[in-house]
Amino acid sequence: LRRLFRFLKANFQAFGRHWSVYVLLVVSINLVLTSLIVPGLTWGVNRLLVVNGIGYLTYTNFVSVLTKHPLVLISLVLLVLLICGLVYIQMAFLFRQIKRIQEQTPASQWQLLKQSGHDLLTLKPLTMLIMIGYFLLILPFGQIIFKSVLLNKVTIPAFIIQDMWTTPKIWGPIILVYTLALILSIRLITFLPETIFNKKLSTTRLLQKCWQTTRGRFWRLLIKVGVLAIAITLVGVLSQLLFFNLQRYYDQNLPHYALLLAILNLFILEIISQILLAMSIVMILQLILKQAGYLVPSETRVKVILKQRSLRIRMRQGAAMLLLILVAAGVALYDYAYLEGAMDNRPALISHRGVDDGNGVQNTIPALQKTAREKPDYIEMDIQETKDHQFVVMHDNNLEELAGVNRTVHELTLA
């Protein structure tokens, strides 16, 4: 436990030395991604589907798109490759920035961005294929290591994963996939920095080096990554609980100032969340760089810089605080408008499975007749196909809970 506390203390201190630069780095990247890159990609996909007369794209109509619109599928594959390339540039830029900040080496943002783009272009073909597989198959299941709004666009949706867990027959394969992804994400944790800082190695030798670097250290690395994630999450949860209870006190004892204090609480929470986001990304990537042997900060230089408290450092801290305040202020304005009802639009009323406040059995005509009196805008029903290609209105895939029959709907006939 002492080692873990020392490990946490060292990481928090390392982040604290340069917190302003890290916050500027992470918040700026996220602003660019969420404001420009992701909307641009979303618009491109939507436009592609509209032009080709495709209303939506899910696993249910994937085969149809594959056979009837092969060019659309090719375009989507190219889009996925583009996203993987952008994720690589993002990570290369972050790795290079963290290394530069820790080692206090001079380099402009533009230089590092160009180097990150060059890192992608100089990847060997086989290394690039492995990198794509790493992003698509390993990182989505090991998001404790790295999260990106870009990767969220090419991962399996959460509702599909949840639906898979409802089928006990495939629990084994799911657990196996998660276990393998976790093992590979730790054993190949140095894969990305090796591709960035050690381009001379062949793909085979690079993988061997990654495997050797983490040999005998799997549990140690897993515990370190887990401890960092838990510690940061705990800080976030405690801060939310603190402000939640403060707001409850304000609502009960200071009702005239409750709205103003709610905006202030949300403002502070947004600043905390942005700092914790930067902390989680930087600490994990810093750990990876150290494990790969590409991060050797000079303690002497750090101490000199801390003593000098140069104008440049103070300017960066000011810029970081200004950016945090602007982001938090934008969120606070939105929260104010929301809490005051300025953004209220009449929401669409949707009856879930045709019922209203438990007024009948889900997906049944009697319940629908009662629900219709409330005049909802939409009614959501669950329709499934039987073995003899008939349709039944039913939610559960399996009849065991309703009828005591451990069979799925598509295994039985309507008769």
What are these regions (language model features)?
Residues L1-P347:
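Hydrophobic alpha-helical membrane segments
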